[in-house]
């Protein structure tokens, strides 16, 4: 008689959790002709090497100096067409799937109702060009609506940004939860003082600070950082990494007759 053997019941298998991670790449604040060309080339190469599934621009791809209220003597003569053209060239080079408008593009929408027919017409034409570029790229274009504008990537909000202070990353995290933004041109990571412990990521800019005349007298301009963001995301998570493009430290020339 063979001994009776008892087989152990097989342990139930847990259902496989497939996160479906994908790569993303993003920039902010290129400001058309004010772009730092070396940093821009480095960003495009980094994008190509990383081969992201999803690319975004967080806004201020144009500078729109001619439309700036409170502008100086030279701003009003800033030609509209070269500024718009160079900004759209950058978008075509980047080929993003998501284009957010920033506060600089928002000037165009604001001047649609200008009492000056020429200004209103110029704004209308510029906006049409932006829409046409987004359509050619098959990209989603999101108009700037201040604190209400943005799109979700996993569990992080992508937005241009509205706060301009040294604690912007922390304050944005307290407003929105996990958030990736630009606007201040200064790389920063800040934790929100909330029970869910959110993180704000300021991804800097890709501008040449000495070219920005209206910021030449601000101490904070020295903190501007050329950078971009990359990382991975899935339906319910996002893992950003900010990459800083190192620049040489500016030096003052010696006195000629010293």
Predicted segments with their positions:
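Short acidic-hydrophobic surface loop/beta-edge motif
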Residues: 15-17, 147-154, 191-193
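A structural signal for short, well-ordered beta-strand segments and their strand-loop junctions
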Residues: 55-58, 96-102, 143, 158-159, ...
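Core catalytic region of metal-dependent phosphoesterases/phosphodiesterases
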Residues: 6-8, 27, 32-134
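Acidic, histidine-bearing metal-coordination/catalytic regions of metal-dependent phosphoesterases
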Residues: 1-27, 34, 257
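Conserved beta-sheet core of the metallophosphoesterase superfamily
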Residues: 156-242
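Metallo-beta-lactamase
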Residues: 120-155
């Amino acid at each position: 008689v063979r001994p009776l053997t008892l087989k152990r019941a097989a342990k139930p298998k847990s259902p496989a959790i497939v996160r479906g991670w994908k790569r993303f790449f993003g920039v902010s604040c290129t400001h058309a002709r004010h772009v730092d060309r070396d940093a821009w080339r480095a960003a495009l190469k980094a994008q190509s090497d990383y081969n992201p599934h999803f690319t975004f621009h967080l806004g201020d791809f144009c500078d729109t100096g001619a439309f700036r209220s409170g502008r100086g003597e030279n701003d009003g003569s800033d030609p509209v067409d070269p500024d718009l053209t160079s900004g759209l060239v950058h978008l075509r080079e980047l080929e993003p799937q998501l284009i957010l408008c920033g506060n600089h593009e928002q000037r165009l929408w604001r001047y649609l109702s200008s009492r000056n027919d020429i200004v209103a017409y110029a704004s209308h034409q510029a906006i049409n060009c932006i829409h046409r570029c987004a359509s050619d790229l098959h990209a989603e274009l999101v108009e700037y609506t201040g604190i209400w504008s943005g799109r979700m990537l996993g569990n992080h909000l992508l937005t241009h940004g509205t706060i301009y202070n040294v604690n912007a990353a922390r304050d944005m995290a307290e407003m929105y939860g996990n958030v990736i933004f630009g606007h201040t041109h200064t790389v920063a990571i800040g934790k929100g003082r909330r029970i869910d412990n959110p993180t704000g990521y300021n991804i800097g800019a890709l501008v040449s600070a000495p070219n920005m005349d209206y910021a030449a007298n601000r101490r904070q301009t020295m903190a501007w950082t050329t950078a971009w963001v990359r990382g991975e995301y899935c339906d319910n998570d996002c893992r950003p990494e900010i990459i800083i493009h190192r620049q040489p430290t500016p030096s003052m020339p010696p006195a000629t007759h010293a």
